[in-house]
């Protein structure tokens, strides 16, 4: 009788342990929501400055400026913060804080803010995320904190992080943000010294690649032409090639953040991609 009871107890404990292990290992639900963070006031003649190979003559495009909210279980990450309202003709009429409010998310709930690079159209609304850890490429952070930052580095956008000594994680390598492979900051230098892109793995849609300014529009991504203002041409070409290989291997959806034609690859706000 005692032996049977002991075996029963052992069996119950084993089943409970298996159940708890399965529960602990259950993947967090991941969603991705695009937030409008500005749009071009006028079309841009991209054949002048956005290629060094004469790849697209007389091509004019209207740029868009995108921010993103990633929900990982009960945790949140923001990717890029666009222009601040009122700071540019391209700035959004509604700021990111108010957009997050529509999603019932406060800035204080955001655990990470990832920045593709230090330009003002990606860093204009950093200040409200007081509890977040800033994820930024090492090369870009070095410029932001340099006594003589390079032209185009939006030092003012990072003022609160520097003055208040907020949490910063400069990235010299790729970063698995939540530790389960679902959200990875990818090193894609070239546009700036520490430029990064983002991989988000979604259960239904599959992997999504957010390019930052690795490429500014589809023709830029496909032709191999490099904007004249990029920091490093060779690094840009290598990073684009890396992105193409990742996209092919993972069968990922590539979202070029400035290309208005790519907005429709994700659900319209406030709906998330899942």
Task: Describe each region flagged by the PLM.
Residues 80, 117, 191:
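Conserved G/P- and acidic residue-centered "switch" motifs that form tight phosphate/ATP-binding loops
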Residues 86-87, 95-96, 137, 190, ...:
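Short, electropositive alpha-helical surface patch
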Residues 1-4:
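Positively charged n-region of N-terminal signal peptides that target proteins for export
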Residues 6-19:
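Bacterial N-terminal signal peptides
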Residues 20-105, 109, 160-163, 173-178, 205-212, 248-253, ...:
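Metallo-beta-lactamase
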Residues 89-136:
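Active-site metal-binding motif and surrounding structural segment of the metallo-beta-lactamase
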């Amino acid at each position: 009788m005692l032996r049977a009871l002991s075996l029963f107890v052992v069996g119950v404990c084993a089943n409970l342990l298996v159940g708890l292990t399965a529960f602990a290992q259950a993947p967090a639900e991941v969603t991705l929501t695009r937030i409008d963070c500005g749009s071009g006031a006028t079309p841009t003649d991209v054949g002048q400055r956005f290629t060094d190979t004469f790849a697209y003559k007389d091509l004019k495009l209207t740029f868009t400026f995108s921010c993103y909210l990633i929900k990982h279980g009960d945790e949140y990450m923001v990717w890029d913060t666009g222009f601040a309202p009122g700071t540019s003709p391209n700035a959004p009429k509604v700021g990111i804080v108010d957009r997050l409010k529509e999603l019932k998310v406060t800035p204080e709930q955001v655990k990470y803010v990832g920045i593709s690079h230090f330009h003002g159209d990606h860093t204009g609304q950093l200040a409200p995320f007081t509890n977040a850890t800033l994820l930024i490429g090492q090369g870009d952070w070095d410029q932001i904190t340099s006594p003589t930052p390079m032209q185009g580095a939006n030092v003012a956008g990072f003022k609160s992080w520097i003055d208040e000594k907020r949490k910063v994680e400069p990235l010299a390598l790729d970063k698995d943000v939540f530790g389960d492979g679902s959200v990875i900051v990818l090193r894609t230098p070239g546009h700036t010294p520490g430029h990064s892109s983002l991989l988000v793995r979604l259960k239904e849609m599959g992997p999504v690649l957010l390019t930052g300014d690795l490429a500014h529009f589809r023709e830029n991504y496909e032709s191999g032409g490099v904007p004249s203002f990029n920091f490093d041409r060779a690094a840009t070409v290598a990073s684009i090639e890396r992105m193409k290989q990742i996209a092919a291997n993972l069968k990922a959806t590539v979202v070029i953040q400035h290309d208005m034609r790519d907005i429709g690859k994700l659900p319209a706000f406030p709906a998330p991609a899942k």
